[in-house]
């Protein structure tokens, strides 16, 4: 089933996002990549558009309808020009999810208005040096001490690590070899014992700041527990069902941006007396890329639609992520090929888009893991 993302109730939002991308975000994309910094006014723009809180409960600034779809639309449209900026939407949604959908009302009433009013950035502390896609391998521990929990461990690949005001931190709270025994806690940046470690210098999405976050005897009150004790793994999996379509939408946007660049160039560049687009091998690249984009769009917005309706979308979310992530790497690689030597230089955006696309195959569960998830979901469906 194809989901029409340009129905009347979404068109106003889409038009506003597209205008912001054209006028404000696209002109700065190369500078963001070169400097590794997104300017404060771009953060404010995303807040003003409502994209930083779109997946929050409505009472805290979220969308009453279609939050997953709107998140995907924002990621797709922005990533056409700047994938680093699109990543801000994803990490805000991911890092806030355990709080917004697992925090107790008293905690939410105290924290959420401050986050929205002060425009505070979220971080997500799950990955560790020995635990990436294998979430169950985390070693960061939280130990109960009176009315507090004391956290010790090192987290890595923390998007927004150096600049977040608060983090959702997954810890081991019970020795258990299965999925039980993990819990999320809200940890605020100014908590004693929390420090930022190594800042990563990445291949792509350089405008998004990524670092280690070190927790040494970090003490948080018991009320900062997010979700049920020892059931954090389940909350993390629900978070993935929201984030994976959004990452796929980011990959879709990168692909569309690269496609637009190479299709235009193929019409303007002449070789052997005719435009590139009239050479057989180039027409195949154009056609294959267009087909991948359309197929990926269908998967993405179907997964987002299921999420918005409160239905299980795990299989489609993982399908969308691995399909579109792999497609983005292929499309951006082919775009460089169409540009030839020019595409290999920093002077044309397809080089940046290629570097950005690679991350969509890796984060929020590597694409190899996504295939395992899909196969497991199919087995479960057939056994019912």
UniProtKB/Swiss-Prot annotation:
Oxidoreductase is among the record's keywords: yes
Cofactor dependence: FAD
Key words of the record: FAD, Flavoprotein, Oxidoreductase
Signal peptide interval: none
Catalytic reaction equation(s): cyclohexane-1-carbonyl-CoA + oxidized [electron-transfer flavoprotein] + H(+) = cyclohex-1-ene-1-carbonyl-CoA + reduced [electron-transfer flavoprotein]
SUPFAM superfamilies per the UniProt record, alphabetical: Acyl-CoA dehydrogenase C-terminal domain-like, Acyl-CoA dehydrogenase NM domain-like
EC number: 1.3.8.11
Superkingdom of the source species: Bacteria
Gene Ontology process terms (BP): protein tetramerization
Gene Ontology MF terms: acyl-CoA dehydrogenase activity; flavin adenine dinucleotide binding; oxidoreductase activity, acting on the CH-CH group of donors, with a flavin as acceptor
PROSITE patterns: ACYL_COA_DH_2
Leading EC class: oxidoreductase
InterPro entries cross-referenced by the UniProt entry: Acyl-CoA_DH_CS, Acyl-CoA_Oxase/DH_mid-dom, Acyl-CoA_Oxase/DH_mid-dom_sf, AcylCo_DH-like_C, AcylCo_DH/oxidase_C, AcylCoA_DH/ox_N, AcylCoA_DH/ox_N_sf, AcylCoA_DH/oxidase_NM_dom_sf
Protein function: Mediates the conversion of cyclohexane-1-carbonyl-CoA (ChCoA) into cyclohex-1-ene-1-carbonyl-CoA in biosynthesis of cyclohexane-1-carboxylate, a by-product produced during fermentation of benzoate and crotonate to acetate.
Family as reported in the entry's similarity comment: Belongs to the acyl-CoA dehydrogenase family.
Record text on subunit structure and interactions: Homotetramer.
Name of protein: Cyclohexane-1-carbonyl-CoA dehydrogenase
